[in-house]
């Protein structure tokens, strides 16, 4: 029976109900984490608008330990007086009424990123709780909200000499149900961008969960941004092309530098808001660059001999550019402002590019010559690659209609249901072929190390047999003229390599290929890394597969603590003592794992000694700090067995009038310094470490002995006791460490790595594209010195090195 469709079925969503009902319209995707982080950006953008108006110099963003986020600025502060129409405070209007704000009349803000008056009210609507504090008129105001509704009117809670706004919000987990944790890297990327775009603002970011903290204050504006993006690349034009001017109320700022890479990297911003999908400013930029450079090449006769046709792609190969426009009333395709659609922008940018770039090329003839040479060379390589493809197609060696012979394809035709495993080596490929589900799992074995595409020209890439097989198997092509995501044959591309150094290298080469040649596959979430087990543990007829060292450590501790007996001279309750010891071991392991994931990670020996070393309370007394660190270093030098020399020093922190100790490790040619800063010494982690030491000291006073089977061990150190227990436990176990996938038979490979019900896979994502770009340049690029420095800096953190 069909329900009657009449006026009773028409629902009116009032106030913020519409936001809660359809949050994606206002904030973006609430499942993939982008909408969650957009909440922070909406508030930060308001602070930036205050800066653009000349009233804000400092912004502080904090991720709190309960996963709430606070944003504080020193702007004018949200208005607190009573709104003449709504009869409530202006602050409450802004927080609870859609399309309210001070950016509609262009009087309070000439330029702003906020346009629709929905940003902060949307954040409030999608928050379980929100706290608002305003510093204004020498008064401190406060108001709290629950699910978008005020719990009480705005009230004065004290006096103040500062101005600004503080907002702390707790996202509603009824709205954000999938990805609920704020990612430091995503926030860091955006705040770094804002610092480059607004070089007069100091921006702080702190994560109380991990003690990560950064300050962003880049002088040099977008020219400094270009240098940051081109880090570890060879610049083609040493003098960055830069101009800033205003035309038809459009303020345009552009910086460009070409480099020796093969990828273009253009970032677009409107009123400081990024447009990941570009828009009319990007269209105008591309048209202006292509037209101007072709005109200059023709006028100066650079291309007389070869008459090579120059395309837009050729002019932009290796180009890094920042386009930043400021416009009074920009038009975007949606509330998330991912694409600019203001039609008047395109022609203005195109004409300004033409005027300023011609002037730059004439005033910088050496830079101009190198730029044009690169462009012509790119065009020649493109033509050579096209001819090579045509020849190979005629020969049948690159027939994109024919799948590579080594591919064992699946029966499924729907890409959403299909998987392809890129397997290291023919041996593992054979096992994978036998163990797979033929219905939807394809196998492509890759022989040896593929080309490093970071420093390989395109014509060489398409002639590489392994890469050609991979490109053909995927079906979507990598050439810009032929690339089509609709032709992709698999939506699950799984990299499966050995757990050794060679496997890690091959995995990195494949990730470099996808990042540089098929970045959209990573953005769409199609690329995965298989997690084959590192260990097989066998006791009698029982077998268990363990995926990594951390899990192996947990498993060993769990088994080691079983069937133990603890005795002491007082003959106290054995079960009670065992529980105490198990808690100490559990806390010890928890601290080690937590510290390794923390920015304040110290080497194991330092961490262990901090447990037994007295807690450092008084950082204001230089002698106390000096004595404390010297005694710690003395212990470290006595206990170290790895030829490491430990030295200490203390440094005065002028801001807080305290003394902070540090430890320097010297091993062979490597020197690493670990600072024990006030943030760490007052952190939860340091309290846990020293508290564990105090617990163990009391436990140790009773002279406890541990029995495992027929053996007895005196408990005098947590780490050594645990190692002894694990060693004794291993006697009844057979532990196999898999170095290669080929060591597994087909059934084992299926059960551990390929069965969707039991396998573990890592989805490849990019939280911070700029940092990812710099990392690929460092590790896979031509420059040796940055790579050497990176290795030296991280050498002491390396684990599981094959020797």
UniProtKB/Swiss-Prot annotation:
Positions of disulphide bridges: none
Record's cofactor remark: Binds two Mg(2+) per subunit. The magnesium ions form salt bridges with both the protein and the DNA. Can also accept other divalent metal cations, such as Mn(2+) or Ca(2+).
Gene Ontology BP annotations: DNA topological change; DNA-templated DNA replication
Catalytic activity: ATP-dependent breakage, passage and rejoining of double-stranded DNA
CC cofactor: Mg(2+); Mn(2+); Ca(2+)
Site residues, Interaction with DNA: 449, 452
E.C. number: 5.6.2.2
SUPFAM superfamilies documented for this protein: ATPase domain of HSP90 chaperone/DNA topoisomerase II/histidine kinase, Ribosomal protein S5 domain 2-like, Type II DNA topoisomerase
Residues annotated to bind Mg(2+) 1: 424, 498
Domain Toprim: 418-533
Annotated positions binding Mg(2+) 2: 498, 500
Keyword annotations: ATP-binding, Cytoplasm, DNA-binding, Isomerase, Magnesium, Metal-binding, Nucleotide-binding, Topoisomerase
GO molecular function: ATP binding; DNA binding; DNA topoisomerase type II (double strand cut, ATP-hydrolyzing) activity; metal ion binding
Family affiliation: Belongs to the type II topoisomerase GyrB family.
Additional free-text comment from the UniProt record: Few gyrases are as efficient as E.coli at forming negative supercoils. Not all organisms have 2 type II topoisomerases; in organisms with a single type II topoisomerase this enzyme also has to decatenate newly replicated chromosomes.
Subunit-structure text: Heterotetramer, composed of two GyrA and two GyrB chains. In the heterotetramer, GyrA contains the active site tyrosine that forms a transient covalent intermediate with DNA, while GyrB binds cofactors and catalyzes ATP hydrolysis.
Record protein name field: DNA gyrase subunit B
Species, as recorded: Buchnera aphidicola subsp. Schizaphis graminum (strain Sg)
